[in-house]
Every structure is written in structure tokens, then in C-alpha cells.
């Protein structure tokens, strides 16, 4: 296993093609932003898509034949991300993450969600361990068969079932200092 936390442009040429089983990328959103001494300026949608292509195609080459990729984006750049991802990978799903952070807006809705695109190199051969990501949920309608719980368990802390995860995430929060 290997985690690389580096500037993409500094390390990409040193990574062999087909190396990664999983890539998680959180590129600059198409906003005017100053972050840790670096400035990113918003651009036209076409220019932003070309910016994404300038490194995304190379990332796809680094993905293993059965590899997966997750790409994060806000609502303004999400459609550009989708178009660029579809040029090289198969999109399996779009996860909507409801986040607690977000700035209020006096003349608009507060932006408190982000998209996380889940894409793979080969839609017929990729790894997804659904058992590892099942959710423990409180049972609201405790069905029984022959007096025994059907698809749920009764514990000291209540009635729960393990259920398949959805593409709406509202149970993950990021500390305010991040």
C-alpha cells in the first residue's frame, strides 16, 4: 500500500502507469481562491475543462486496469468534472455529500453540499466492498418471521439493521479547523 501526498505536477511523471488501485482527487474548484500561498482564478467552463484535462488524462493512465477514482467538486464545477471524467472512465455513481461547513448567503441558498464522482477504468471489473461500507441503521418497522427478526438484530442499545449505503452522505463531518 502506498499513499502519495504531494503536488501532482511534481510527482506524476515518476509514477508508473497502472500503479494505483484507487485515486482520490480534490482539484481546485472553479473559484477565485487563495490557499497556502497559491492562487486559483475562476475561468470559463471550457477553460476549466481544459485545465482538468491537463492532468486528468495522465491520472487515468496511472490507474490500474480494475482501478477506481473518486473526484470531489462543488455544484458549479461538477458538470465540467462529469464531462471530463466520462472522456476516459466509466462513471458508476455520483455521491452527494451534505457538509456542515459552508458560508451563508444573503441572496442565495447556502452551499452545504458537494459531489463526489465515483468512476472506474473497467465497469465490468472493479473492486467495491459493499460489506465494508454497510450502514448500521435503527429499525423503524421491525418485521419478524416465525417470531425472529427479519434482516435486523435486537441489541442492548436497540433494534438495528445493516443496510446498503446510499449515494447521499449526511453522516460525515469535517472539523472546522480543517
Q: In which residue ranges do the predicted regions lie?
A:
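Core catalytic lobe of class I
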Residues: 1-178
